């Protein structure tokens, strides 16, 4: 429990200390923000700072810091270190610069930002990559909640249309269309802060429940510094890929421009972007602690946690909430596993619309132009979702690549931020170091992960245990990271001029 409290204190202190260092490095000033300068009444709308924070928190969080943290807890309390230091030195830095670089470039999407600082090829790669990723995220967060609602009705003894996934999927997709189409302050600006508060209350309730109930004890890092994973899965780099939301996640860079278009002052950036990521880190720390504390540890392995997660991640959330908060926990759990994914799904589709609008220079003030992009974006999501509900389409194979692509996206954004800081003649090491680290993570996982090259190289024992060839993968990961750092240092020696700043037709 002591190590948990130390990590919690470090996270909070990190916001005030290192967050200030990051802010001073960027150098916010009193220039006119896109929300004030453009103010189209749709995507560029000035919102109060507290709403910006709550919306950003819910955009980047959803159930990510809960699911990911509990999966990460399979490795034991060592995951506390990744959540804490990953958030302070990588995730919050990533979120801050993805938001503030966007703000400095008229609220540009992350694909356009990547193009400005990493070149035209990377821009086009990121455009396609971002749209595909966002539509996939939006679709998954439509199908998942629809299935959970069906389960609730079936468990309550209901029959008929309300027990069909297709019925609820259509309702969720209709809501997504409305939220993607209308002004950001009409739905997202009004209900997101409420759900953001619920997400925080749920984490506080779980934390209090662990502390006040004597049967639960959070294990110490120094007592379980090695891996406690029941399947013997290596800490490096699997834990760093599994725990994305709650440490560092490339998906956040697609969401930060939404709030960059709604800020009244650049000086709100630290609270909105860095602060929201630290808050997500705290939430992840609480849920990781719950995963370590509530379930049986056998022979130094988290076997009890593995068993509850085998019943489904939603079941695990429900179980934790009930054990720590009783009947109140049931209501919060249902709200969490249904509302939180939906609030991530609608902004994923909204971000996809904005990426396309920046790509094809389509002004979004006119409703016809928004409709022009909303229809195909939601149409693809509907085809995937309905096809999956009817058993015609199985996109889970593609979705398995999300974990790796998510962290690779974070790596790319950090390298873009490093180039930005170089051009601004500022300390680029605060982004280049985590960029190098994430390059090693992504490269190592690409060699080890069963979704990637691991499916051709890893082998299983007679007992079905996967054996990972870490002796080859680890040096490869380090070599790739050193190579990328070398390319970056070589590039900044050759470049002496500022990149072309695009206005994106705004």
Role assignments for model-derived ranges:
Residues 1-19, 72-102, 111, 122, ...:
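Extracellular loop-to-transmembrane helix junctions
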Residues 138-156, 164-168, 180, 199-226, ...:
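Hydrophobic alpha-helical segments and their helix-loop junctions in multi-pass secondary transporters
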Residues 99, 209-221, 275-319, 386-393:
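Extracellular/periplasmic helix-exit of transmembrane alpha-helices
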Residues 10-66, 268:
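Membrane-interface "cap" regions at the ends of multi-pass membrane proteins
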Residues 123-127, 162-170, 275-284, 292, ...:
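Loop-to-transmembrane helix boundary motifs in multi-pass membrane proteins
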Residues 10-11, 15, 56, 90-106, ...:
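Helix-loop-helix module between adjacent transmembrane segments
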Residues 48-64, 207-215, 224-287, 332-344:
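Hydrophobic, membrane-embedded alpha-helices of multi-pass small-molecule transporters
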Residues 5, 9-27, 129, 145-149, ...:
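Membrane-interface loop-to-helix entry segments
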């Amino acid at each position: 429990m002591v190590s948990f409290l130390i990590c919690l204190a470090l996270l909070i202190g990190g916001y005030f200390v290192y967050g200030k260092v990051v802010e001073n490095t960027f150098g916010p000033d009193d220039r006119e923000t896109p929300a004030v300068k453009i103010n189209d009444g749709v995507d560029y709308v000035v919102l109060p700072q507290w709403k910006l924070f709550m919306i950003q928190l819910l955009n980047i969080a959803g159930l990510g810091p809960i699911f990911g943290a509990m999966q990460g807890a399979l490795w034991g309390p060592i995951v506390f270190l990744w959540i804490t230091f990953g958030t302070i030195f990588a995730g919050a830095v990533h979120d801050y610069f993805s938001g503030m670089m966007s703000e400095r470039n008229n609220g540009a999407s992350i694909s356009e930002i990547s193009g400005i600082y990493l070149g035209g090829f990377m821009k086009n790669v990121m455009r396609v990559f971002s749209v595909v990723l966002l539509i996939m995220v939006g679709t998954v967060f439509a199908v998942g909640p629809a299935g959970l609602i069906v389960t609730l009705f079936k468990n309550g003894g209901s029959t008929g249309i309300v027990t069909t996934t297709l019925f609820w999927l259509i309702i969720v997709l209709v809501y997504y269309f409305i939220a993607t189409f209308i002004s950001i302050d009409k739905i997202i600006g009004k209900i997101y802060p409420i759900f953001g508060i619920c997400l925080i209350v749920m984490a506080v309730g779980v934390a209090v429940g662990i502390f006040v109930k004597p049967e639960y004890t959070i294990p110490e890092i120094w007592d379980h510094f090695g891996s406690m994973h029941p399947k013997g899965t290596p800490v490096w780099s699997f834990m760093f890929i599994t725990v994305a939301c709650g440490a560092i996640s490339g998906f956040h860079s697609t969401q930060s421009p939404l709030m960059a278009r709604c800020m009244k002052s650049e000086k709100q950036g630290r609270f909105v972007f860095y602060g929201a990521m630290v808050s997500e880190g705290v939430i992840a720390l609480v849920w990781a602690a719950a995963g370590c504390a509530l379930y049986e540890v056998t022979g130094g392995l988290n076997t009890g946690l593995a068993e509850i997660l085998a019943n489904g991640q939603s079941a695990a959330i429900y179980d934790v909430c009930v054990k720590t908060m009783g009947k109140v926990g049931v209501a919060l759990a249902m709200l969490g596993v249904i509302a939180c994914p939906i609030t991530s799904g609608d902004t994923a589709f909204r971000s996809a619309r904005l990426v396309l609008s920046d790509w094809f220079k389509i002004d979004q003030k006119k409703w016809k132009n928004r409709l022009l992009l909303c229809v195909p974006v939601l149409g693809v999501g509907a085809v995937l979702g309905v096809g999956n509900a009817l058993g015609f389409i199985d996109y889970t194979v593609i979705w398995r690549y999300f974990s790796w692509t998510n962290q690779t996206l974070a790596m790319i954004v950090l390298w873009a931020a490093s180039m930005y800081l170089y051009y601004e003649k500022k300390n680029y090491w605060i982004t280049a170091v985590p960029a190098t680290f994430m390059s090693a993570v992504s490269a190592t996982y690409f060699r080890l992960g069963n979704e990637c090259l691991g499916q051709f190289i890893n082998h299983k024992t007679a007992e079905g245990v996967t054996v990972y060839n870490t002796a080859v993968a680890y040096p490869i990961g380090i070599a790739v990271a050193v190579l990328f750092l070398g390319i970056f240092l070589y590039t900044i020696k050759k470049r002496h001029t500022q990149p072309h700043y695009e206005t994106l037709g705004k």
